[in-house]
Amino acid sequence: MNPDNYLYLSALLFTIGAAGVLLRRNVIVVFMCVELMLNAANLAFVAFSRMHGQLDGQVVAFFTMVVAACEVVIGLAIIMTIYRARRSASVDDANLLKH
């Protein structure tokens, strides 16, 4: 399969994720859209590394997945803290943790 198709798919996934981050108010949906954007970047890294015959992009994608796993743990803990305090999962309630 042509590597350009993977790059087009990556751009489409990143655009969908960015639109979700900008347009949605629910923290869980925004969180999933950020993860979609990270996966789109991983797909682009792997496609570029495949095009050039090197493993650098795949190594970067692996480390990005490790960072994304840590982000999931910390992000869900923050979301649960906000939900317990306000019984809402809205982006507007994120300023609750300032105090």
From Swiss-Prot:
It is an enzyme of class 7 (translocase). Its main location: membrane. It is found in: Cell membrane. One of its GO terms (biological process) is ATP synthesis coupled electron transport. It is a multi-pass membrane protein. The chain crosses the membrane at residues 3-23, 28-48, 59-79. It holds the Pfam family Oxidored_q2. The keyword Phosphoprotein does not apply. GO terms for molecular function: NADH:ubiquinone reductase (non-electrogenic) activity; quinone binding. Belongs to the complex I subunit 4L family. NDH-1 is composed of 14 different subunits. Subunits NuoA, H, J, K, L, M, N constitute the membrane sector of the complex. This is NADH-quinone oxidoreductase subunit K. It comes from Mycobacterium sp. (strain JLS). The gene is nuoK.
